[in-house]
A protein has these predicted regions:
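Extracytoplasmic small-molecule ligand-binding "clamshell" domains
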Residues: 22-91, 234
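Flexible hinge/capping segments at coil-to-helix
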Residues: 105, 117-133
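Short beta-strand-to-loop elements that line the ligand-binding cleft
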Residues: 65-72, 135, 152-159
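Extended ligand-binding regions for polar small-molecule ligands
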Residues: 53-61, 127, 131-132, 137-140, ...
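Short helices/loops that flank or line small-molecule/ion binding pockets
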Residues: 60, 69-70, 74-86, 101-103, ...
């Protein structure tokens, strides 16, 4: 009887250890899936995009399982701090302000920002004075407009899709967002124009996009960085990049 009980106890302990190992091997990524080509919902209501493919490649290197969870952009960092998710990969600029709240992986994408409007509506960035410009709420683009262009009215949106629709319908004059994202709109619309040059202010747009991780989780940051180096070395990063942005 003792032998049976001991065997059963060992079995239960082993099962608990195995269950914990499975839980530890799943990395829960939060993202805001209205930001093509980085993250968006496909026709089957599944999250797709550059960030998703990259995260899957990193998880493969770490021998871990990825899961992806759609959240509003301005809730990503709070959700990390409440430990609802392990990481956030959502075209997020690495900035000093964000580094006060979370840690980041090494940069995985170099970024710039751009103003876009309907053709012939806004001549240049100086002409934005007194205009209404759409931005995503909680984004560095919003901070840039408020602090660097106080003469411009910043109009916050929960998603850039909503801002784009309002611009097309004349409710706002321009949209300010990541260059790669607004470039997607030009593929579908022929009446758009860039307003001035790209903006690369490092205070707001950092030193590229990084994967945000809750402070104190240095182990995950190190694993992400090691895996990022690996996928860049083996050519997988380039394959993913070319899939979405071309050579």
């Amino acid at each position: 009887m003792k032998k049976i009980l001991l065997t059963s106890l060992i079995g239960l302990i082993s099962a608990n250890v195995a269950a914990n190992a499975v839980a530890q091997d799943e990395i829960k990524f939060a993202m805001e899936a209205t930001y093509a080509p980085f993250e968006y919902m496909d026709e089957n209501n599944q999250i797709q995009g550059f960030d998703v493919d990259l995260a899957n490649a990193l998880c493969k290197e770490m021998d871990a399982k990825c899961s992806f969870h759609n959240q509003s952009f301005d809730s990503l960092i709070p959700a990390l701090k409440f430990k609802r998710y392990d990481a956030a990969i959502s075209a997020m600029d690495i900035t000093e302000a964000r580094l006060e709240q979370v840690n980041f992986s090494n940069a995985y994408y170099d970024n710039s920002a751009a103003f876009v409007s309907i053709k012939d509506k806004v001549a240049d960035q100086n002409a934005l004075e007194g205009k209404r410009v759409g931005v995503q709420n909680g984004s560095t683009h919003q901070s840039y407009l408020i602090e660097q262009m106080p003469g411009v009215t910043s109009v916050p949106y929960s998603s850039y899709q909503d801002a784009f629709i309002d611009m097309k319908n004349g409710r706002i004059d321009s949209v300010f967002g990541d260059t790669a994202v607004v470039a997607e709109w030009f593929k579908k619309e022929d009446n758009l124009a860039y307003v001035g040059e790209r903006v690369t202010n490092p205070k707001y747009f950092g030193n590229g996009f990084g994967i945000a991780v809750n402070k104190g989780n240095d182990e995950l940051v190190n694993k992400l960085n090691t895996s990022l180096e690996a996928v860049k070395a083996n050519g997988e990063y380039d394959a993913i990049y070319n899939k979405y942005f071309g050579k």
